[in-house]
Amino acid sequence: MIKTRDFTFADGLTHGLVGPNGIGKTTLLRQIAGQIQSGGITVFGEQPFDNQSVLNRVILMGIDNPLPDSWGIGKLGVIGKARWPHWDDERFNELLVRFDVPAKAYSSLSRGQKSAVGFIFAVASGCEVMLLDEPYLGLDTQRRELFYQVLREEHGRTMIISTHHLNEVAGLLDTVSLMGDSPISGPIDDFIEGILELTGPSEALTAAAEELGLPALSRQTTPLGGRVLIDARSASTDPIFRTAQAYGLR
């Protein structure tokens, strides 16, 4: 079990971590992973910072936690096997093939390929706890679907996924934790009906959000404009849909 100041993440479940940009999602994951010291966090009942018994059971991967640029894919497997007590070499090689990762230095991979390698590394580590910080960034549609498929295959491990795509991953999650001024957490079914995702031009999203006056749980810039998650649990959905339609949002 993982306990922080605001949340408790139960063992064996897949947890979504959502919140506005800059709220501290990555920092929280780094604290859980023992990379940053924090007095308010316990993992398996112990402080994770500089605690090898915890660090051997927890892995954090994401675009902000890159692997060394000079390492080739083969070396990653060698290092992983040396570092992680329960490293699964067969699973590592299997997923490299499934994600069609080229045998190149990490530095020469595309952003999506780096995301895939980080995810593969986390899965193959055999760690009981996987912390995935927006692990899908840069993945094309085909590999994104494969990513979700592999997550389903790993169900039963404790996973915390920081995401801007709550509606997209909702079917994989057991719980959601929302970071903010008033943090809340609970089963996914209690949240999903009241959390709405709006997409469209950035200026229209900003104007609509101000008019609605509802909390924005996260914002993300996309090639077509932006995406925002709105906490509408305390509001009627009809005015929201009318406002979204008026601003040309989806």
Identify the function of each model-found stretch:
Residues 130-134, 139:
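Catalytic Walker B motif of ABC-type/P-loop ATPase nucleotide-binding domains
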Residues 34, 38-54:
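Conserved ABC transporter NBD signature motif
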Residues 53, 60-117:
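ABC-family P-loop ATPase nucleotide-binding domains
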Residues 145-160, 164-231:
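ABC transporter nucleotide-binding domain
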Residues 18-20:
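The feature captures the beta-strand-to-loop junction immediately N-terminal to the Walker
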Residues 15, 26-35:
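Short, conserved post-Walker A segment of ABC-type ATPase nucleotide-binding domains
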Residues 141-143:
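Helix N-cap at the start of a conserved alpha-helix in ABC-type nucleotide-binding domains
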Residues 1-13, 39:
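Conserved beta-strand
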